[in-house]
């Protein structure tokens, strides 16, 4: 009987609490005049808001938040203006802070509460001219560096743990702006040794402050990390004790070496800001923030700490939720997102957003995340992403093929720009592009076009329009993986564009598993695999450097499937630091010529660092490791190295198993340094170096 009563009590409590979240609240305190938060005359009744209050900042009133701290307010609805003081440090403790018009408010921490909403509580009509406003500094007049403005999100009993605590902007204005930093993250200027308590960086950071939290990122690949939330890592956290231009004194010595010379250097990132939004209880119920459609404002140089609800869809530290083009001109600049349990910055059904100079440090699941594949014309520039952990799939997530396994940057629509970003020590990927068509997902989506119209298009055909000057190092498994379309891709005039990419200290460096791609100026250093599992079809590589890559520097088509779907050209390929490795080839030969027309053309290939005492090591071209295929297609793949024997005298290399090529009338033999035990070569002439692509730039600016 006690058990039955307990169950009935539990059900009664559950049904009593949750519907309450959808009921309009009665405000206990309302603003009735412009004035300071700490002035009783601002309020009706004439007293300061106290613990547990539900507070309304009434329309046509402006309240200056000047409190050094507050008790935990249950709910604040900003229908007028709540402006944080700029002449003192302030702290607001609150469970639910909603910026929205009207006097009607519920305790839902995701949905909005006014008219013109859809069934999910999302705005579908433009607001009036006067916008409710939460202003914690502005971009032109941020909170001065001498002061802090802090919003602490507390969970209170009776709130829905899936929704609260929260900071939500519903077709209103929300401005969160701290004191700018010239560079929120920089590169090391000199190598740090274990035991060093002073570091040198490559740029002046005199605007950083004593007491700031910083990280020095990993320089080595520690291990295959998996989740690695509780595993050994190479990134180290420290506190600044002193700053002198380029020199930073730490609170305690470093444990590991961190590279700071040459091409490949670790980063130093500042995690402190003077505008802070944080969960009050990181080990308890965490909070989240979001902008809804038709909102205004932006975020700069703020810290978002201990936010994100693990495993809950839509509850992220920074979330632009289905805003479409309505927030064009908004930006997230110089933000630090620290210790998130659900992403760093989520761009969901949103276009024309700028995310620049941000630092993401520790996330469960992907970090910088574009959620449903419809997002276009967003720009992610000069952001740092460190330690995105393996996370759970989210219930009802829009892209069912995404395992949420820990990428610093994850996106599914190529019409977004990623430039000058760095990914470090993430569980699975530094950068991951993935777009699949499945029985439970149709990749034909309604997408914004450059002319402003909308069109249903297979987003797998939209090229990665600009992926430039990005870097990845010390990753758990992959550095850059562009894959998933099963051979569907863009046309020859709009190839995927990958430029100026730097990858080091990783396992799989560059998974180029998309057709129709131009990749130029790619540096790979200290990887196990270089170009890995490529979908060779209209691939053009220029100026590719692969160094100290010990297993398969330039993989065959689709690796163990050994399938080449079309032709490739490689102009400028340098192999170096070959001090280890066995008899694997530098370039693996694909066995199967899927359409019968595939060819591979190489030019300006150099090899440095072979061991002269081991001529059997590192032949230039051979079948390589893994299965020894007998070709399943009638034709093999011919490989041409232009000018190998001198100007106009080319090498043609084939697999010794390709019967059709063995019978093409040429005399094949092994060539020292060029062929291995399962490849043969001959000298040919009169072979043109093909032009596979004819790229044009006919897209508008991104933001």
Feature locations, PLM:
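Bacterial N-terminal signal peptides
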Residues: 6-15
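Surface-exposed or flexible loop/turn and strand-edge residues in extracellular/cell-surface modules
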Residues: 26, 32, 40, 51-52, ...
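Acidic Gly/Asp/Thr-rich repetitive segments characteristic of extracellular carbohydrate-active
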Residues: 28-59, 204-213
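Right-handed parallel beta-helix
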Residues: 43, 273-274, 297-306, 328-341, ...
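Extracellular beta-helix/beta-solenoid repeat scaffolds
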Residues: 53-187, 206-208, 212-242, 247-291, ...
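Short glycine/acidic-rich loop motifs that flank beta-strands on beta-rich extracellular proteins
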Residues: 83, 87-88, 103-104, 281-288, ...
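A conserved hydrophobic secondary-structure block that centers on an alpha-helix together
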Residues: 194-244, 311-314, 320-346
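C-terminal accessory/interaction regions of large nucleic acid-associated machines
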Residues: 544-703
């Amino acid at each position: 009987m006690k058990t039955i009563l307990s169950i009935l009590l539990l059900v009664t409590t559950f049904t009593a609490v949750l519907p309450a979240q959808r009921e309009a609240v009665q405000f206990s305190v309302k603003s009735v005049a412009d004035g300071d938060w700490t002035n009783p005359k601002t309020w009706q009744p004439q007293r300061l808001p106290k613990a547990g209050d539900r507070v309304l900042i009434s329309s046509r009133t402006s309240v200056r938040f000047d409190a050094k701290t507050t008790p935990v307010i249950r709910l604040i609805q900003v229908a007028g203006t709540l402006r944080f003081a700029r002449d003192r440090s302030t702290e607001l403790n609150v469970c639910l802070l909603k910026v929205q018009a009207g006097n009607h408010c519920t305790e839902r921490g995701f949905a909005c509460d006014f008219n013109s909403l859809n069934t999910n509580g999302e705005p579908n009509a433009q607001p009036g001219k006067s916008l409710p406003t939460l202003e914690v500094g502005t971009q032109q007049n941020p909170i001065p560096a001498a002061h802090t403005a802090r919003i602490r999100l507390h969970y209170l009993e009776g709130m829905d743990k899936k929704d609260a605590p929260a900071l939500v902007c519903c077709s209103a204005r929300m401005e969160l702006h701290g004191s700018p930093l010239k560079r929120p993250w920089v590169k090391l200027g000199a190598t740090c040794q274990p035991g060093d308590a002073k570091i040198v960086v490559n740029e002046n950071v005199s605007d950083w402050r004593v007491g700031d939290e910083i990280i020095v990122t990993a320089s080595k690949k520690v291990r295959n990390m998996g989740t690695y939330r509780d595993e050994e890592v190479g990134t180290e956290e420290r506190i600044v004790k002193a700053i002198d231009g380029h020199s930073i004194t730490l609170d305690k010595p470093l444990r590991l070496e961190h590279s700071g010379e040459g091409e490949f250097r670790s980063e130093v990132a500042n995690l402190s800001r003077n505008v802070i939004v944080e969960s009050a209880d990181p080990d308890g119920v965490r909070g989240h923030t979001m902008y809804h459609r038709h909102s205004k404002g932006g975020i700069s140089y703020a810290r978002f700490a201990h936010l994100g609800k693990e495993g809950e869809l839509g509850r992220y530290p920074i979330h632009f939720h289905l805003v479409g083009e309505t927030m064009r001109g908004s930006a997230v600049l110089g933000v630090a997102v620290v210790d998130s349990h659900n992403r760093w910055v989520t761009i969901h059904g949103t276009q024309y957003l700028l995310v620049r100079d941000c630092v993401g440090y520790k996330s469960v699941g992907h970090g910088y995340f574009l959620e449903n594949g419809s997002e276009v014309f967003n720009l992610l520039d000069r952001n740092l992403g460190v330690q995105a952990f393996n996370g759970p799939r989210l219930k009802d997530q829009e892209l069912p093929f995404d395992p949420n396994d820990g990428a610093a940057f994850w996106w599914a629509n190529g019409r977004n720009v990623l430039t000058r970003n760095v990914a470090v020590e993430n569980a699975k990927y530094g950068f991951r592009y993935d777009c699949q068509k499945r029985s439970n997902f149709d990749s034909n989506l309604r997408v914004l076009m450059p002319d402003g119209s909308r069109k249903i298009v297979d987003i797998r055909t939209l090229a990665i329009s600009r992926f430039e000057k990005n870097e990845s190092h010390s990753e758990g498994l992959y550095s850059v993986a562009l894959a998933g379309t099963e051979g569907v891709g863009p046309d020859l005039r709009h190839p995927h564009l990958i430029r100026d990419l730097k990858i080091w200290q990783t396992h799989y460096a560059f998974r180029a598993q998309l057709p129709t791609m131009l990749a130029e100026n790619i540096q790979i250093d200290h990887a196990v695999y270089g170009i890995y599992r490529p979908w060779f079809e209209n691939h053009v590589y220029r100026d590719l450097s692969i160094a100290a890559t010990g297993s398969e520097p330039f993989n065959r088509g689709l690796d163990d499937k050994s399938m080449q779907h079309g032709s490739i050209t490689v102009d400028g390929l340098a192999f170096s630091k070959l001090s280890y490795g066995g008899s694997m080839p530098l370039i693996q030969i694909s066995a199967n010529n899927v359409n019968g027309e595939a060819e591979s053309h190489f030019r300006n290939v150099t090899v440095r660092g072979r061991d002269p005492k081991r001529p059997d090591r590192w032949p230039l071209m051979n079948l390589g490791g893994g299965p020894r295929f007998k070709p399943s297609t009638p034709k093999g793949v011919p490989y041409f190295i232009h000018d190998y024997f001198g100007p106009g005298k080319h090498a043609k290399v084939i697999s010794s198993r390709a019967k059709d090529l063995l019978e093409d009338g040429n005399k094949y033999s092994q060539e020292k340094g060029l062929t291995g035990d399962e490849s043969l070569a001959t000298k040919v002439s009169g072979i043109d170096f093909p032009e596979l692509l004819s790229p044009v730039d006919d897209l508008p600016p991104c933001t």
